Amino acid sequence: MAIERTLSIIKPDAVAKNVIGKIYDRFESAGLKIVASKMAHLSQNEAEQFYGVHKDRPFFKDLVSFMISGPVMIQVLQGEGAIAKNRDLMGATDPKKAEKGTIRADFADSIDANAVHGSDAPETAAVEVAFFFPGMNVFNR
């Protein structure tokens, strides 16, 4: 498997629960390195741009409203098979369907307030990383 980078966002619900460190521990325990990170409070424009792929979906407005409801923690994870590994750590989008021990099963409340976002493919990972960390804000470790 190749070394990959993927974007991860700890969403407002998980930030409010003060579980950033617990989630970071899961990334690192799984062999993922955090090569860039920042806390931000997304503007409506940023959230709309980032989730633009969903703009025609019925949940788009609620998603944007949720993502701007409080600060988020944004990080780039790097490691062998980082995209799939992060998605396994996150668990199913709906925490009720997520396997026990996954981030969403342990820290999410609903399909809307589901604790984390993770890139789903190498192409989207590259776009998402560049969206939040343009240029030289990501470092090899």
UniProtKB/Swiss-Prot annotation:
Subcellular location: Cytoplasm
EC number: 2.7.4.6
One GO term describing the cellular component: cytoplasm
Record: residues binding ATP: 11, 59, 87, 93, 104, 114
GO molecular function: ATP binding; metal ion binding; nucleoside diphosphate kinase activity
Reactions this protein catalyses: a 2'-deoxyribonucleoside 5'-diphosphate + ATP = a 2'-deoxyribonucleoside 5'-triphosphate + ADP; a ribonucleoside 5'-diphosphate + ATP = a ribonucleoside 5'-triphosphate + ADP
Single GO BP term: GTP biosynthetic process
EC main group: transferase
Cofactor(s) the protein requires to work: Mg(2+)
Keywords of the record: ATP-binding, Cytoplasm, Kinase, Magnesium, Metal-binding, Nucleotide metabolism, Nucleotide-binding, Phosphoprotein, Transferase
Catalytic residues, chain numbering: 117
Known role: Major role in the synthesis of nucleoside triphosphates other than ATP. The ATP gamma phosphate is transferred to the NDP beta phosphate via a ping-pong mechanism, using a phosphorylated active-site intermediate.
Record PANTHER family: NUCLEOSIDE DIPHOSPHATE KINASE, NUCLEOSIDE DIPHOSPHATE KINASE DDB_G0292928-RELATED
Family to which the UniProt record says this protein belongs: Belongs to the NDK family.
Assembly description: Homotetramer.
Protein name: Nucleoside diphosphate kinase
UniProt source species: Polynucleobacter necessarius subsp. necessarius (strain STIR1)
